[in-house]
Amino acid sequence: MSEWEQLVDEILRSLWEDDPVFATACGIHDYDNKLASLAPDTVEQHISVLKRFAAQLEQFNGNLSKDQDADRRALLAWVRGQIINWEAIQWHKKEPALYLDHCLYGAYLLVARDFAPLPQRMECLANRLREFRRVLDEAKVNLQPTQVPQVYVETAAETLEGAKAFLQSVVPQAVEQLSDESLRRDVLRAVDEAGVALTDFEAWFREKIVPEAKGNFAIGTDLFVQLLRDEHLISEAPDELEAMGREVLERTKVELAEVANAIDPDSPWFELVERLKDYHPPRERIVETYAEEVAKARQFIVDKNIVTVPEGERLRVVETPAFERATTPYAAYMPPAPFDENSEGLFYVTPIDPKEPEEVQRDRLRGHCIYALPITVIHEAYPGHHLQLTVAARSPSKVRKVFGNNLFVEGWALYCEELMWEQGYTSDLRVRLFQLKDLVWRAVRVIVDVGLHCKGMSFNEAVNWLVNEAHLEYSNAVAEVRRYTASPTQPLSYLTGKMAILKLRQECQRREGSNFSLQRFHDRLLACGGLPIRLVEEMLQ
């Protein structure tokens, strides 16, 4: 093993030990019975370990190939991003949901991913559930009530409700399948312990955090720029990104109006979208309709030589597990863990629940509109996330297996929506209408991301942008903005990444002239895993 591979292994092992849930998500199962320690001294220790790794990565001077040096810089960018999050932004002092999410995701992965026999996973689950109390006690020490923004209070209150539902319905559903009576009792006892820990935390939260919460969610221009520069390797200033978002927004609105006019000259685009949502598959064929579209999209990219689909790659379209349905109203993608034996991706589709009120069922059906459905499949499955992440998981580079930069990962999926239209996957203008509607929303995300964190944009102003420009339902817009306030630079990653990929493609076309092959371009792109887009540009030089 080379010196470089040893360093990567050392860094990964340390990250997995520090964050057992991250390990489980990667398909490393040595720590499945633990949750991370978030005690103040452990956090300090974690920061100094990250700084040591950053220094080692900066100063590494072994013989590296071009690929390995790109990996070194990508890993360094990720580590620097973590240092900014822990040391400068200090989410652990102001975001209560951070602790709840860690506990829940740690438990959820053991239920959702079928990487080992159920009894083995349930034993680990019982241990993780017993650790809820420790993690939530650490939250009480770390959280500074006056630093917590009001919006994070709302997010945490909602997450607490979700946590109770998870313990009351999800875990018991999994436990029912156990034949070992004593293990079943053991897990249910752990569920009770976790429930009490959550109730205690909620009481503390309502007494100590809620009355005092008056923090500012904006991280400010300096830290925003630092994230762009150090984690994403982007040199553009927030103002330049915002200007790009505004330009794409205006351009897309013009095209939307043209497309809407061609379909029906008497309706503005947003009214047309609402009307077209009435066209959906019959409720009993929703899952089959997605499965057919997935097969069709996969066949299209093979037939048209758009990108190489790796041998043995699999994606299964299944009903969303019961425990996921509350948070997945329509569809979602569950990627395979990079180090798990099973490399099958799962495409979840949530069936319509006949027990829900008629009005809710009608809304859910409208969410599966036949003109929006192909775009969801392209984005999540082929040639979007599933294909990109499957290729990354098979990379010989551990860095590319594990670390995906948002700009590349989300940029690729959004680029695929445009790519499939331009390649003639469909010529139906109604599908194009839905695609452009989503592009408007992605452009607004850039404006709002910069606005919230750098320009003093208020929560309500951001909601209004989404409602007035992207025509999101009010409740969806609120949920979106809540997420944006706690994930600076994430919302802008979709469009920024897509534009960078398009620009890179144009450069390669110009350079290679008649020798340019779209398939080769995409294959080289995906071979980079999820490297920051700037490094991908260098790799393709």
Outline where the language-model segments fall:
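N-terminal maturation segment of proteins
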Residues: M1-Q541
